[in-house]
Amino acid sequence: SNKEIEIGPESGFDNYIMAIESSCDETACAIVKNGREVIANVVASQIKTHAQYGGVIPEIAAREHMESINIVIDEAFSQAKENAGIEPEDITAFAGTVGPGLVGCLLVGLNAAKTLALVYDRPFIGVNHLNAHLCGNYLDTELRPPFMALLVSGGHTQIIDVESYSKQTILGETIDDAVGEAYDKVAVSYTHLRAHETLSDLV
């Protein structure tokens, strides 16, 4: 979006950002006041759906997002009205995860956020979800840059120099598997081992 938006107490008025996340296996929508106060937070998990496959299946995940996206958005608007008297027209900007993540999944949340921005004539803010991992700490702590961060998520393990919440430099990262991927491989191997032991008991 070409619209500019000033966020925070220094802007002189309250800001309400609706953020949509759909990078992997959870469809989430939240509304945050002035960057710190969560007035709505809705998550639709797909854990049970993917458990039978031993991991996230991208095509199934994307379909699940499509089924859940309108539900979580409607619930977020309902929570915002109940908790703070906020209507959809009061939203200052709409944000959506642009990556990294599963392409089909990302598109669901991204299209929803951009559509809402268009309908309500508000700015759209694209968010890198790794950056969001860092910024999320500011919701309930007074953690302010500059600082060094160790980011460990499902697909990334990085050491980051955080100059500000909008400017970070990756100082180092794993060159093959991230810690989360290593955990996943161990879990899959263990599951196969347990299945083999169970089968042996039956013979």
Where are these regions (language model features)?
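N-terminal beta-alpha supersecondary unit
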Residues: F13-D90, G96, P100, H129, ...
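Conserved phosphate-binding catalytic cores of ATP/NTP-utilizing and phosphoryl-transfer enzymes
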Residues: E6-G8, F13, T115, G126-M148
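Internal alpha/beta core interface subdomains
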Residues: D177-Y190
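Short beta-strand scaffold segments in enzyme catalytic cores
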Residues: T27-V32, A149, T157-D161
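Conserved small/polar residues in nucleotide/adenosyl-binding loops
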Residues: T191-T198
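Glycine-rich phosphate-binding loop and adjoining helix at the ATP-binding site
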Residues: D90-C135
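Short glycine-aspartate micro-motif
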Residues: I17-A19, A95, C105, F147-L151, ...
